[in-house]
A protein has these predicted regions:
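Structural motif corresponding to the intra-repeat A-B loop/turn of tetratricopeptide repeats
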Residues: 6-7, 55, 100, 133, ...
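Amphipathic alpha-helical segments of tetratricopeptide repeats
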Residues: 17-30, 66-78, 111-122, 152-162
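Residue register of alpha-helical TPR repeats
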Residues: 36, 43, 81-84, 88, ...
Length: 182
């Protein structure tokens, strides 16, 4: 969610909205928790959540993200596509809420993403989710728990071939948690 060039966020929002209107012409963007979505439609809404965030519309991004997450949970689908979207969305919501300084809520969504990942077969994002949890804990002044998570995460990331991510965690650890023991 954090990777964008900042250029055409508004245009991206418009294009994603237009794409969704192709299959859901009468969708009410103020309340779609009761809608049923195909994996493609759900993916468009997940991307729209990210686009709103990148455009600085955090509250809209949170609202849309929470509604699509509710709709996906309500569908009880066994399709792995839906589980992947739920994991991505819960993780994205945790990042947006963290940026808003709403750390308790951010931690709840990060833990939801963690649980969905662990309980399912989709663990590809788990290291990034664990890093997010550690960052949230650091922001909540739970530095020792944050440090322990990061110190365990770095060798694991290197082991599974996520060296760049491990370097990022190491850099964050050195910058934010060096010589900090509370």
């Amino acid at each position: 969610i954090r990777m964008h060039d900042g250029a055409a966020d508004e245009q991206m929002e418009d294009e994603l909205t237009s794409a969704l209107h192709l299959t859901k012409p009468n969708i009410d963007f103020n309340d779609f928790r009761r809608e049923l979505f195909s994996p493609t439609e759900a993916n468009i809404l997940v991307m729209l959540t990210a686009a709103k965030y990148m455009a600085g519309k955090n509250l809209e991004a949170i609202r849309i993200g929470e509604e699509i997450l509710f709709a996906l949970e309500r569908s009880h689908s066994r399709l792995s596509d839906y589980k992947v979207l739920q994991i991505n969305l819960a993780h994205n919501l945790s990042q947006i809420l963290q940026d808003e300084g709403r750390y308790q809520e951010a931690l709840l969504y990060a833990k939801k993403a963690e649980n969905l990942s662990i309980c399912g077969t989709e663990q590809f994002l788990l290291p990034e989710i664990e890093f997010s949890i550690a960052q949230i804990l650091n922001n909540m002044k739970k530095r020792q728990e944050s440090r322990m998570r990061m110190e365990a995460l770095i060798p694991y990331m290197r082991l599974i071939g996520k060296k760049e991510m491990a370097d990022l965690v190491q850099e964050y650890l050195e910058k934010n948690l060096t010589n900090d023991v509370n």
